[in-house]
Amino acid sequence: VQQWGVAMATATKVITQLRNEGLVSVTPGVGTVVAEVSPTRRPRLAQRSPADSGATAERIVEAAVAVADAEGLAAVSMRRVASEIGVATMSLYRHVADKDALVMQMMNAALGEWEEPDAPPERWRERLEVAGRQTWELFRRHPWLAPAMSITRPQAVPNALPLAEWVLAALDTRGLDMGTTFTAYITLFNYIRGTAFNIELEAEAQAQTGIDNEQWMDHQEPVLTELLTGGQFPTFSRLIQLDYDFSLDRLFEFGLQRLLDGLAMMVGDNQ
């Protein structure tokens, strides 16, 4: 980065894109290197014929989501999106007022991927489990989505309502007042969203360092072991002996079940 005068943010975006397309890979102790064998590349936007080469709201949002999925929301700009679909930047403004409006449409498109199961569970807990896992998968597919959404200043995104309605309807059968029901829904959503924040942060860290979280922990183990040699933290020291495999997916599922355990106790349901 210093040698070539490239900003860290720019280098991070480029490396992330190359990794997503299978052109580079992470080598332990070395960093990011050119991949020996090119895996299946990340799907790119379909090439359009001259007849349908004009900008449309759908194409603009599709291109913006693809950029954000690959490189993060910071990489999305009107100029970048116009370049992706092969049109002049100013032509986008006939369909989207500005980047803030574009991000709103991106969120709406991503949340619109949620579909109610064909055979939804009847019991409230099973329904919330399904909703929680579906929401987690949405954030997995679109790492930028969790940071883009707000709990304290919620955006009016139409496609957020079907999922919210589905969860609220399940909780509404438990005899809670509407305020408590809504608070339970927000708590569930914010837990999933908060955990999902780490997805994009980890992707950025991998791009910057060239190592994944497991390799990073391996590098930290000698330092941590030295910190624990004094015997001041005997309980924590026992963790060093464990072959603990950290996983965001496992962390999410553990927290989801404990949160639902708490709701079950609150509504007096031992299902």
Give the predicted meaning of each segment:
Residues L201-Q271:
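C-terminal peripheral helix-coil segments that are non-catalytic and often amphipathic
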Residues V1, A11, L18, V81-A82, ...:
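Append "Primarily bacterial transcriptional regulators
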Residues P117-A156, P162, Y185:
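Hydrophobic alpha-helical connector segments
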Residues G29, A74-R80:
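Ser/Thr-centered, proline-biased regulatory motifs
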Residues A7, I85-T89:
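Short coil turns linking two alpha-helices in DNA-binding domains
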Residues Q3-W4, N20-G22, A70, E84, ...:
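Residue cluster at the C-terminal edge of the helix-turn-helix DNA-binding motif
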Residues L163-F189, T195-E214, D218-H219, M266:
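Hydrophobic alpha-helical bundle segments that form small-molecule/ligand-binding pockets
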Residues T16-A70, D100, Q105, A109, ...:
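HTH-adjacent hinge/linker in prokaryotic transcriptional regulators
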